[in-house]
Amino acid sequence: MLLDLNRFSFSVFLKEVRLLTALALPMLLAQVAQVGIGFVDTVMAGGAGKEDLAAVALGSSAFATVYITFMGIMAALNPMIAQLYGAGKTDEVGETGRQGIWFGLFLGVFGMVLMWAAITPFRNWLTLSDYVEGTMAQYMLFTSLAMPAAMVHRALHAYASSLNRPRLIMLVSFAAFVLNVPLNYIFVYGKFGMPALGGAGCGLATMAVFWFSALALWIYIAKENFFRPFGLTAKFGKPDWAVFKQIWKIGAPIGLSYFLEASAFSFIVFLIAPFGEDYVAAQQVGISLSGILYMIPQSVGSAGTVRIGFSLGRREFSRARYISGVSLVSGWMLAVITVLSLVLFRSPLVSMYNNDPAVLSIAATVLLFAGLFQPADFTQCIASYALRGYKVTKVPMFIHAAAFWGCGLLPGYLLAYRFDMGIYGFWTALIASLTIAAIALVWCLELCSREMVRSHKAV
């Protein structure tokens, strides 16, 4: 049977589901808090004016592209630390965590310089008002200063979650969300003696929140008794380039996968633009809701990475294979709920974004397509995270590149323009590309996990 799902009893299945839920739920809530921070930025910038909102939209797109790509690179720490934890290598867990912080700091500084360098070309490329371009530049400058803290935070995030302590990540994320509200209010509108920075104030608030999050996680880990045996904060460790090389080897393909997926969805918006504003608005509704729902398989997948890595560290290879299957089944059950939610409640969901009749009509149909691709999207996401637990990241990268850019964009363009399917041609191609990615990744996971079990039985 696929991934040996019939190997263990139903009680073992329920136990694994409970363990996955205990890890996934706090991670999901932490992501909700992070999305809430972006929502507050949008509301506050919109309150300052449409030009400020436009500046934040442009600046945040640049920041998000760098942040998401680098976040993928830092995700290499999850399987590394989880496997060491499962193997009982306490000292190596702490040392790998320290090297992760160093790596994150260097990567963040590189990201900061990259964003600085991008400001002038962005301004030269855009043909907007001086105010929008200037506010965007200020926003990018402030958020660039957040990059070192953001990557250190991701290192600590990976450390805590890989040691089965996602609750503290959730608490820090909600504290950051709460802090972001008054900071935005103060910096955007100029309260308590501060100058009114408009949309740029959102960038300053983002910088402050990321530095707070990194510092809060560090203090929490330093004070919490559970973490003391690992010694992350007990001593100072010099950068180890051998560990850096390992992080890069595992993480670079993950980062590129994130970039390929995010850029493909972003590029489709530009290809839809000739159909008119109503179609672009409807597309944004579909992508926004799909992005929110995508947090669910991401959380299940992250929990699966930790559980699989831990089991591999304990040399429980059959268990790791079984957990891969349980993760997928859990995702499929949740996907059914999301499909029904999108199909049955698509009208009220769309009306939350826009009340224009033309947009409502198009977006309601778009959500039907979005509902259809949920099972495939959940599957490909969780399967790629499971493979990450085995430290297999290059193959998923190639699969994502072929699926999203080869099977998604080009066929989508042909269906939209040559076969007159319009916006729905792109969504049809997305469903096909996600299905292809899901099948390929599950098959890869089946072969990888089976070979791991077989090779260690032969020893």
From Swiss-Prot:
One GO CC annotation: plasma membrane
Disulfide-bond pairs as recorded: none
Keyword Oxidoreductase appears in the UniProt entry: no
Domain of life the protein comes from: Bacteria
Subcellular location as annotated: Cell inner membrane
MF-aspect GO terms: antiporter activity; xenobiotic transmembrane transporter activity
Predominant localisation class: membrane
GO BP terms in the entry: monoatomic ion transport
Protein topology in the membrane: Multi-pass membrane protein
Keyword Transmembrane helix attributed: yes
Keyword annotations from UniProtKB, A to Z: Antiport, Cell inner membrane, Cell membrane, Ion transport, Membrane, Transmembrane, Transmembrane helix, Transport
Cited InterPro entries: MATE_fam, MATE_MdtK, MdtK-like
Transmembrane spans: 20-40, 53-73, 100-120, 132-152, 168-188, 202-222, 252-272, 285-305, 325-345, 358-378, 395-415, 423-443
Pfam families reported in the protein's UniProt record: MatE (PF01554)
Family classification: Belongs to the multi antimicrobial extrusion (MATE) (TC 2.A.66.1) family.
PANTHER family documented for this protein: FMN_FAD EXPORTER YEEO-RELATED, MULTIDRUG RESISTANCE PROTEIN NORM-RELATED
Physiological role: Multidrug efflux pump.
The name this protein goes by in its record: Probable multidrug resistance protein NorM
Species for this entry: Neisseria meningitidis serogroup A / serotype 4A (strain DSM 15465 / Z2491)
Gene (name only): norM
